[in-house]
Amino acid sequence: MTPSQGAIHREQRRQAWAIHGGPVGLGVAALGVALARLPLPSRRLRERLFRTVFGKKYPPGLNEAEMDRPLAEYPTLNALFTRGVRPEFRPIPAGTPQFLSPCDGTVQDVGRVERGRILTLKRIEYTLESLLPGTDTAAFEGGHFAVVFLSPIDCHRVFAPQDGELHEATHVPGSRLLVHPPFQRAEFPVYTLNERVAFRFTTPLGPCALVMVAGWGVGNITLPAAPDFRPRQRELATKTWAPPLPVRRGEWVATFELGSTVVLVVPPRDEVTPLVSPNDKVRYGQPLFTYPG
């Protein structure tokens, strides 16, 4: 049963209080998106702030060697979150029958699609129809899924998991509940309650769906291939590419402004081998599933 809006709002307040610590923390959290876009005037201030904040809260901190520019050249927190990565640190395997990780992060769940549903380790069940509105979900029956959580120190760009074509991106309005695993509860199925953008691809291995789920503090989800696609938070909207947009594995397709979670759903095939397990750290371009062939 879907919780009421009142229950969702109460849960949002409870989560925010728990993670940010009282009314002051709630106020800072509410201003988080604006603060993340606030320019930091001094290069020295940026370096000290970024290293201190991320090093203490998310050890071992930021991997500066792989960033696409020096740390002091990111003028805002949002610019740091949405940074690129030097390509030599993300080699993309060419021509392999595999679906690759679409992002950096930590694997939360890996499993099978059964009876049109996915079941997470926290025993929260999601139907593909609710996760991917308007998609022919029957094509994924018996397939696999992976859920990757992006922490604040991860690169917040999202990439194509296989060669193929991008057909559409659908913005689904919703809430902004926390997606961090300790805060997930069965009464509030965040992947279908929260605002999200669902992408539909075709690939040589079959259809593929990728869902970017917004969480607490996410400012926006942007698409390099459609910079004008900025639907309102409460608006269901679809961007369709006709003809479909060719994409290469490892090609940048979208960005979280701040961060959240990506759900990847891949098609059924005999002898598909999952290559990762829950709690594994992954980088974009790293193989998640190998297909026979």
Name each model-derived stretch.
Residues 1-293:
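Contiguous, well-folded functional domains in the mature portion of proteins
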